[in-house]
Amino acid sequence: MKKKKALPSFLYLVFIVLLPWGVSFSFNKCLELWIKNWWNTRQSQTLLTAIQEKRVLERFMELEDLFILDEMIKEKPNTHVQNPPIGIRKEIIQLAKIDNEGHLHIILHFSTNIICLAILSGSFFLGKEELVILNSWVQEFFYNLNDSVKAFFILLVTDFFVGFHSTRGWELLIRWVYNDLGWVPNELIFTIFVCSFPVILDTCLKFWVFFCLNRLSPSLVVIYHSISEA
């Protein structure tokens, strides 16, 4: 009877997992035009925002230096540029447009993520009964396994998340989160996260193995340590 109830619950879990991608794709298409019109209307009175100004100014100085160098190579006597040449002006406008697109990307992804989070929270709340049934079935399935198989699965999960090669996976994950949210990558934050989070997670898993599994099945803990130390 529990297995029959677990199948709809499992399908509901698959639906929840796939829901964010479907919602993100749908709302990206719906919100993109509206956000673009709103942003362009808001930016119609100014070409550069305060956020863009520093980046564009740095790029302008680079272009101006390149232009002066080019004039010196051509042996023109007047190498001091009073006004930006047309090519540099076009480059500045192009940089402003690129920055605008970046800000639109951030706003669009932030909006869709908020909507996804709201829908996902509602789905968890409305499907609480199905998730409880699925959780009880998974626990029953796990407890019915012999201790060797349990130890194998526990070791597989722990090595997957906190093993030697897991740091690369965590780095890819946080980079994906930054890219999805439209944030500027920060290598310092990436390094701190990759160095600290797996260690914290490993400590929590060891605590769970020692204190929780030891009460459930001492032989399971012995088998787990024998396999991990082999």
Swiss-Prot record:
It is found in: Plastid, Chloroplast inner membrane. It is a multi-pass membrane protein. GO terms for cellular component: chloroplast inner membrane; plastid. The chain crosses the membrane at residues 7-27, 106-126, 145-165, 181-201. Coiled coil: none annotated. Keywords: Antiport, Chloroplast, Hydrogen ion transport, Ion transport, Membrane, Plastid, Plastid inner membrane, Potassium, Potassium transport, Transmembrane, Transmembrane helix, Transport. It holds the Pfam family CemA. It catalyses: K(+)(in) + H(+)(out) = K(+)(out) + H(+)(in). GO terms for biological process: potassium ion transport. Signal peptide: none annotated. Contributes to K(+)/H(+) antiport activity by supporting proton efflux to control proton extrusion and homeostasis in chloroplasts in a light-dependent manner to modulate photosynthesis. Prevents excessive induction of non-photochemical quenching (NPQ) under continuous-light conditions. Indirectly promotes efficient inorganic carbon uptake into chloroplasts. This is Potassium/proton antiporter CemA. It comes from Oryza sativa subsp. indica (Rice). The lineage of its organism: Eukaryota, Viridiplantae, Streptophyta, Embryophyta, Tracheophyta. The gene is cemA.
